[in-house]
Amino acid sequence: MANVESFDLDHTKVQAPYVRLAGVKTTPRGDQISKYDLRLLQPNRGAIEPAALHTLEHLLAGYLRDHLQNVVDVSPMGCRTGLYLAVIGEPDEEGVLQAFEAALRDTATHDRPIPGVSELECGNYRDHDLQAARQYARDALTQGLKVQKTILLQR
């Protein structure tokens, strides 16, 4: 099986909440696509409830695009401790951190309907929790986000 970057990360040594450059891929045409680990919870110490994570995905998909250019995708992690961000190019981690903080501030105060929540727009439109999503955003902001360097497993 192909190597998976996140399986080489020492999850016991990172300190959430954080932003981490998880990798950069070069397309056949030479474009760069950067993947960022946007971690809200400490690995193996908790998990975001699925409805809250689904709402975070919807809100951050829009709000991150408001604060950062060339966003390709925002996707929840299977472990439910954060999300991945894919961006064209190689924005510096500090710039991604600032955009993530701004998007979390927007999420923490979001008081309108959740975007993309209808049977036509979403594959599981009933599974959302705005209040919990707002609380996760507030908690991460209160704890203070930072840039986390990749710490590889010693094998």
From Swiss-Prot:
UniProt keyword annotation of ATP-binding present: no
One GO term of the biological process aspect: quorum sensing
Residue ranges the record marks as coiled coil: none
Residues bound to Fe cation: H54, H58, C122
Cofactor binding, per record: Binds 1 Fe cation per subunit.
Cofactor(s) listed in the protein's UniProt record: Fe cation
E.C. numbers: 4.4.1.21
Catalytic activity line of the entry: S-(5-deoxy-D-ribos-5-yl)-L-homocysteine = (S)-4,5-dihydroxypentane-2,3-dione + L-homocysteine
GO molecular function: iron ion binding; S-ribosylhomocysteine lyase activity
The keyword Iron appears for this protein: yes
Pfam families registered for this protein in UniProt: LuxS
HAMAP family: LuxS
Job description of the protein: Involved in the synthesis of autoinducer 2 (AI-2) which is secreted by bacteria and is used to communicate both the cell density and the metabolic potential of the environment. The regulation of gene expression in response to changes in cell density is called quorum sensing. Catalyzes the transformation of S-ribosylhomocysteine (RHC) to homocysteine (HC) and 4,5-dihydroxy-2,3-pentadione (DPD).
Classification via NCBIfam families: PRK02260.2-4
Subunit structure: Homodimer.
Family classification: Belongs to the LuxS family.
PANTHER family according to UniProt: S-RIBOSYLHOMOCYSTEINE LYASE
Protein name stated in the entry: S-ribosylhomocysteine lyase
